Amino acid sequence: MADDWESAADSEVVIRPTGAASVNKWEGEDEDEDIKDSWEDEEEKKDEEKPTKTEAPAKPKPNKALKAKLEQQARLEEEAEAQRVANLSPAEKLAEKLRLQKIQEASDLKHAQEAFGVTSTCGGLDAFNPESKEEFKEFGATLSWKVSQFRESEHFPQFVEDLVRSLCVNLSAADIKKVKMNVEILHSEKLKLEKANAKKPAGKGKGKVTLRTENDDIDGYQKYGNDFTEDYDDFM
């Protein structure tokens, strides 16, 4: 009888599922889905943060037609300039030659100043501040070059005479004597050269004799200078 009661009691026992067991998902399945969603969000953010590549603009190809047109225009301008010069009178041609010479001289002076390291904004002779012997030599070369640009003027000889006198005022008697000796030597050499050039028959195509000085290397840029300018630099 007791066995029957125990069997009945066992058969009436009902195991009720807990709240967690009522969910139709495996343990940890919700966590997996949350992790998956977070991964997807991170991938989307990375895609948004990736910089967009911009293609470099293609280099323009040279326009052959434009290049040919520019060359033709330059050629026509050169021909027109040559025709203009050809139609000038002798006096106008001389004036044009002097104009171009002045332009070239200004360019040469600029190059000479750059070679001497003259970079001051004031420019010109005011930029020099000579202290050493070499610096005074460079300053004298530039000053002589500048002055010699006016050598064709009828007033140039008197100008040089006045300039030498005003410079010698600040010298001692011994220094003035040295200047005087150099001028006398220069005068003697000039007389010899003038006589030699006067004796040569004209029309043989030989150049006249010129006087060379030790400053020729320094004043090599003075391609428009004459003998007097070079000699003047020597005794200055």
Curated annotation (Swiss-Prot):
Coiled coil: none annotated. Residues 1-84 are annotated as: Disordered. One of its GO terms (molecular function) is translation initiation factor activity. InterPro entries: eIF3-like_dom_sf, eIF3j. Keywords: Cytoplasm, Initiation factor, Protein biosynthesis. Disulfide bonds: none annotated. Signal peptide: none annotated. Residues 28-46 have a biased composition (Acidic residues). Its main location: cytoplasm. Component of the eukaryotic translation initiation factor 3 (eIF-3) complex, which is involved in protein synthesis of a specialized repertoire of mRNAs and, together with other initiation factors, stimulates binding of mRNA and methionyl-tRNAi to the 40S ribosome. The eIF-3 complex specifically targets and initiates translation of a subset of mRNAs involved in cell proliferation. This is Eukaryotic translation initiation factor 3 subunit J. It comes from Drosophila yakuba (Fruit fly).
